Amino acid sequence: MVLRLEGSWSLLVGKRFLSLSGDDDGPWDTERVAEWPWQAGRIRAVSHTDISKPDLKICVEFDDESWEKRRWIEVYSPKMKVFLVEQKLVLAERRSHGGSISPVQWPAMTYKSLVDKAGLGPMVSIRYLGEEKCVFLSKDLLTPIQDVESSRLPLKDDQTVNEEIQALVKKHLDETRLVQGGKNIIGSKIRIYSLDPSTQWFTAVVVNGNPATRTLEVNCQEIPALKTLDPELIHVEIIYDNNGKCDKSKRIGGVKRKPSENSGSVDAKHTKSSPEVSQSQGHVHSVPTVFGEALLGCTPANKDQRHQGLPLPANSPPNLGAETPQGTCRRSVPEVHPSCLNAGTKPLKENLTLFPKVTYITKEQTQNINDQNGKYTSLISSRSSSLSDSTNGKETGLKNISEPLLKPTTNFPKECISAKPLQHLNSSIAIPRVNSSVELQRTLDCRPSTSDAHLLPFTEAGVRSHSGSNSQKGNKVDEHVEMEFFTRRNSNEAFYERNENESFWTGSTKIQDNVIVRKSILADASKVKKLQQSGEAFVQDGSCNNIAPHLHKCRECRLDSYRKNKDQKDSTVFCRFFHFRRLQFNKHGILREEGFLTPNKYDPEAISLWLPLSKNVVGLDLDTAKYILANIGDHFCQLVISEKEVMSTIEPHRQVAWKRAVRGVREMCDVCDTTIFNLRWVCSKCGFGVCVDCYRMRKKGIHEDDDSDTFSWFKCVKGQEHEPENLMPTQIIPGRALYDVGDIVHSVRTKWGIKANCPCANKQFKALSKPTLKEDSKQNLVPGERTSLQQSNLVLSPQLPTHEPPVKPAAGSKQTASVTTSPSLSWLSNITSGNVNKENKEKLLVPISKNENKALQTLPSLAKPAAALQTFNSAILTPVSNNNTGFLRNLLNSSGGKTDNGLKSTPKILDDIFASLVQNRTVTDMPKKPQGLTIKPTIMGFDTPHYWLCDNRLLCLQDPNNESNWNVFRECWKQGQPVMVSGVHHKLNADLWRPESFRKEFGQQEVDLVNCRTNEIITGATVGDFWDGFEDISSRLRTEEGEPMVLKLKDWPPGEDFRDMMPSRFDDLMKNIPLPEYTRRGGKLNLASRLPNYFVRPDLGPKMYNAYGLITPEDRKYGTTNLHLDVSDAANVMVYVGIPKGQADQEEEVLKTIQDGDSDELTIKRFTESREKPGALWHIYAAKDTEKIREFLKKVAEEQGQENPVDHDPIHDQSWYLDRSLRKRLHQEYGVQGWAIVQFLGDVVFIPAGAPHQVHNLYSCIKVAEDFVSPEHVKHCFWLTQEFRYLSHTHTNHEDKLQVKNVIYHAVKDAVGILRANESSLSRS
């Protein structure tokens, strides 16, 4: 991270100041400013967070007085002549004492003027780092510091200055975390400034933080009544130990976190913004100034916990500086630090001192309003009163949501059980976005991986909070914190889940002290003795370093040699063999390896995650279940077949291992970063794991440039190469659950009349019978392990055995390994076949017309096979031929005469209309060129106002809240066409989306800006800089030539922070976003909602896109967002359009741009006649045309002398904007025509997954996009995931975050669960 310090610092408390006061009204001689009677000191408390309020009071300590004589002063009183507060670091000219050497640029702290009645004018007070006194210079002699590292270059030999810079950076980071809800300091010790005359400081421990109210919840033994405080009103500092580590209390339950010094990523560089508050919370916060036992800023707060951490590959060099986002867990975790970060990140020194030495000198008798009660509880800020109702309401809601979670999913040994009732703490968490190139370590799931006899008994209880040395009798509180880790092993991200309807937030993590891990069986001497005597095998229940340091260590445990101190080592959280590898004592009492768990060693808890429930599924109804199964049932079958094919290639003598899924861990391929669904190959020595595709490619010897692999493989122990034949086949899904569900799918589709078009009936695939589990004779089942699953809420086919003794395949079964992929096997099995290499990679992407015999020919077609459904009948499921893509529109826009049978008077849904029309109208009855007219509801018998744009190729729905929208939408959507919905701005709260509201709330945040004309990234700017020029060209940042720049905000809000930064805007958007069945997180047709909470849910937004307009004729060749495509579907909402002042003839230029963009007449009339506000010009292309566009761009690149690297892609690189000339060539040379769409204020553009698109802002726009996964486009989602494997690791899309296979599996699992639960209705009907 490069931390820029030229922006204003956010707090007054803790800052040094200079003041000049008295009755003398001057005049003051500025030539002798250094001789004025200045008073210096430090601010300890403030009465308001708004420094502009005229009644602002501050509690200060003066340098020439003792702290006991602190006082409250009025900043804007008549006697105050000048009041300066330290603000930012700059470079200032400094001459040597002799004056013979030319001046040098020296880092200095500037002071900002709050009051200046003496007329300082251009004079600025600064303090050179390394000195104590302040001097005054002209503003012209100051230069901004671009970053901390650049300021250190000329000062490498000055240790004092370097240390002070580091201390300032660390202080600034701590202030940011404190103000933003304690994001990285949960469990940290802090010291709080005391307004009690008897003491200056007292200590407390951070329990939780509330991002919405920006307050901290603390546990203070000195003042038990103190619960919450506001760090913006009272001086708070984090306490560090002698090693520069954040001191963590061992008394508070839950996960303890340490603040980080850097974030390791440009994306993560942004400071966490101040969260949005409601109108009731928006007044100026003030508190009375009270002494005695009084504390400023006491406010109610929600609980908040976070987690941190994780290391790089085993053969990567360590880098010990790291960002520390956080998470939550039900238990305390031993402290572990990541061993590495981005190579470009320079860590701060470990021995930094947070608090520069301050001399506290005397001051006058303080003026105060005595607290009548003399209690800390008597002082409540106005912020507290304004937030109490809303906060309590939120806490109540969270409590209700999380009450079902009180029963822990993790079983703990009796040694860890608390004797007292557990206190449940609600959690509300936000984690900053971080770079995705760093390998994360896994977090701990303490539930057992097997039910072997040696395992300790478990109970369903919480974890006792451990009391440290500071604990006092009578003050012990057992706290049970509902928390979970969500960490991806090989990507720098961690996830926390609020509840099943909420998304996850990401961030890199460091696991800190006090996560309580179940006591290892080896810690019990009596049990160890018994195991030694019996020779019984048991599962490794700790890290390699703790359990078996002399045996092979996994990749994470081997990284301990890079870690600096013992506290960082031996964490079970990181171990890849935890609850996976089996161990055994030999006859000499020496511990040795005894293989790994096998698929038949599952328990009901493990299998329940993968089998459908026998009761109705929340958020899913019968009709929707049928529709989902009709759309993705075949894809699921192909998924099962591909797994069977891989299993059939495994030699009979090879044992398949089972690695159970770990809660919150997204298992990734160590080579290509693709999410592993089930099968993979694992190294038994170090835990290295690769996906099916990477294994097959390596095994077949596919190389790139004849000297390197397409994907690099990390080396094993002692630098040994990982050879494919030495890797161990491993599955995640226990037992035969995958194949059992496949059988259930066929049974259910037959019973419900859902016609299947899967290749399961193909003779070639009949040979791929259900694989049998290979039994390890040494893994004996324990009593109780053979429990019948019929007692659980699982759906199993009656004929499917539950735990019959597995049978090893016969030697002749190897013949199935030679079965080649049939052309009838569609997209899924072919994509994962072994024919993917650098030579033929592009052949897989060839258009259908050029690759007739490829199984991928089904890719462009989004229509699903016919199915005899009751509600979703054959008409809606029948594929539409290519030459009749406008069939429905032709019918709907025709005269509407009755058919022979006549139309139903009140059809239930649109499908009935389609069925009736399709059965009774011929194509010859339809006009050849339908007119783009609005359909009258009375004609069709349903109320779905809409019209057609783009020459009748684009559906535009007019009522965003119409309940019939999704039926009309679905017909176009399933054919891969974009759709638009208008009028959403009438539903939204307009005040929330105005630029001034963003400027007011987040103006001081530091961000990166992008120059849309040059793609240059501008650093060191603030959010306020962007919004100042949003509607005022004269206020925009300018180039060196003095031209105003056309800018867009880069990744703001940063990462997945939208909900936490802007909760009211999030609620406003989710409440009014059209087609909620698809777009809401819990929408019944949003397949991402079917992924269980056990998994890491993908980040689907919302995300904001804020940019100026490109108005001039020269700007028409530039794009606000260049041509690209997304792995998921998206709904992009235009929430605000700003027409900037300061430029003439804007309307004329915008009209020319719209016309130049190939817009149709109806679109132009919306601008010229209806006077709607146009925001952005879109060009969207069908997903099936992607390869043609790719070939065209490569051709143009070659014409321009550009290279086309193998691991880059002209579309995924987002390096092209198709102007009119390129669009014309694309149409003429490749026959590709897209949709030219002008998005007006309130329009929502729906972009199908895999559809290339580009955006050109006409005016300044604020857009918000929400992603989703629809049943109609799952095929494209998977295809894109395969494409992204070939991108370089620098691409944001390289990593597979959508987990398409998991989404398909669990969506089908839930659908068949609903259908099985309603089979009784079939007999009645």
Curated annotation (Swiss-Prot):
Annotated binding of Fe cation, by residue: 1124, 1126, 1253
Ranges of compositional bias, category Low complexity: 378-390
Tell me which EC number(s) this protein carries.
1.14.11.65
Enumerate the SUPFAM superfamilies for this protein: Clavaminate synthase-like, RING/U-box
| MF GO annotations | chromatin DNA binding; histone H3K9 demethylase activity; histone H3K9me/H3K9me2 demethylase activity; transcription coregulator activity; zinc ion binding
Q: Give any Gene Ontology cellular component.
A: chromatin
In this chain the JmjC domain maps to 1062-1285
Q: Where is this motif: LXXLL motif?
A: 888-892
Query: Where do the record's region annotations for Disordered lie?
Result: 249-284, 300-333, 372-399, 772-791, 798-819
What are the boundaries of the C6-type zinc fingers? 669-694
Q: Biased-composition ranges for Polar residues?
A: 274-283
**Top-level division of the source organism's lineage:** Eukaryota
Localization per record: Cytoplasm; Nucleus
- Where this protein primarily resides, as one coarse class? cytoplasm
Cofactor details (free text): Binds 1 Fe(2+) ion per subunit.
UniProt KW keywords: Chromatin regulator, Cytoplasm, Dioxygenase, Iron, Metal-binding, Nucleus, Oxidoreductase, Transcription, Transcription regulation, Zinc, Zinc-finger
Its biological function? Histone demethylase that specifically demethylates 'Lys-9' of histone H3, thereby playing a central role in histone code. Preferentially demethylates mono- and dimethylated H3 'Lys-9' residue, with a preference for dimethylated residue, while it has weak or no activity on trimethylated H3 'Lys-9'. Demethylation of Lys residue generates formaldehyde and succinate.
**Family indicated by similarity:** Belongs to the JHDM2 histone demethylase family.
Q: What is known of its domains?
A: The JmjC domain and the C6-type zinc-finger are required for the demethylation activity.
Protein name from the UniProt record:
Lysine-specific demethylase 3A
Query: Which gene is transcribed and translated to give this protein?
Result: KDM3A
